[in-house]
From Swiss-Prot:
Organism classification: Eukaryota, Fungi, Dikarya, Ascomycota, Saccharomycotina
Function: Acts as an essential component of the kinetochore MIND complex, which is required for the spindle checkpoint and kinetochore integrity. MIND plays a role in establishing a bipolar spindle-kinetochore interaction by joining kinetochore subunits contacting DNA to those contacting microtubules. NNF1 is required for a number of nuclear functions. Cells depleted of NNF11 or containing a temperature-sensitive NNF1 mutation have elongated microtubules and become bi- and multinucleate. They also have a fragmented nucleolus and accumulate poly(A)+ RNA inside the nucleus.
Subunit structure: Component of the MIND kinetochore complex, which is composed of at least MTW1, NNF1, NSL1 and DSN1.
This protein's name: Kinetochore-associated protein NNF1
Pfam families, per database record: Nnf1 (PF03980)
Parts of the chain that traverse the membrane: none
């Protein structure tokens, strides 16, 4: 894990501070500021007033830029993303150095890899790990599907057996071979049951 302030975030702040210093240096140049008020600064009080305005403007501009920079960093979560990038690159370097020495000798030296290549090494490893997890989950899903298919097949067999048994009962007790007069209500009920089974299955 990297420190709370990663190297890339520190460098970004250094770049910002240099840009801010260059911008402020123009405001801090008395020659440039006084040239905007050539007659006014000729008097002592006028020069004092312009100097005070210059100081206040410099402080205001510095505070404004720093506040906006901080808000942008927080809004876009830049520090965390840069720290995560540091971690990815560090992890990629560690993974690369831990590889078999023979494979390392065949490839380029770690110092010769760019940040992009190191990140790609890490992403490749992450993708392979994700593919392995997906394969395992897919195997479990296929196993569940096979179990469900077998249960469905068993259920269909059971339903077919019950249909045959009902058909035999119908033929035995209510078919043309019986000598006893059939109960009309019972016959109708069984007929409805058989029709319902045939429609549903």
């Amino acid at each position: 894990m990297v420190n709370s302030h990663g190297i890339r975030y520190i460098r970004l702040k250094q770049v910002f501070n240099r840009a801010l210093d260059q911008s402020i240096s123009k405001l801090q140049s008395w020659d440039k500021v006084s040239s905007c008020f050539p007659q006014y600064v000729n008097s002592k009080q006028g020069a004092i007033n312009v100097a005070n305005c210059q100081r206040q403007l410099t402080e205001f501009w510095t505070e404004l830029c720093q506040r906006e920079f901080k808000e942008i960093m927080e809004e876009r979560n830049v520090e965390q993303k840069l720290n995560e990038l540091d971690e990815l690159i560090l992890e990629a370097k560690e993974r690369y150095t831990d590889r078999d020495q023979d494979e390392v000798n065949k490839g380029p030296a770690i110092d010769e890899l760019s940040s992009k290549e190191l990140v790609e090494c890490h992403l490749y490893s992450q993708r392979m790990h994700a593919i392995h997890e997906i394969d395992e989950r897919l195997a479990k899903v296929n196993e569940m599907n096979d179990q469900l298919a077998q249960e469905l097949k068993d259920l269909e067999t059971q339903v077919e057996v019950e249909k045959n048994e009902i058909g035999k009962m119908y033929d035995e007790y209510l078919g043309s071979h019986t000598d006893q007069p059939a109960n009309v209500l019972l016959v109708q009920s069984l007929n409805d049951m058989v029709l319902e089974l045939k429609e549903n299955y």
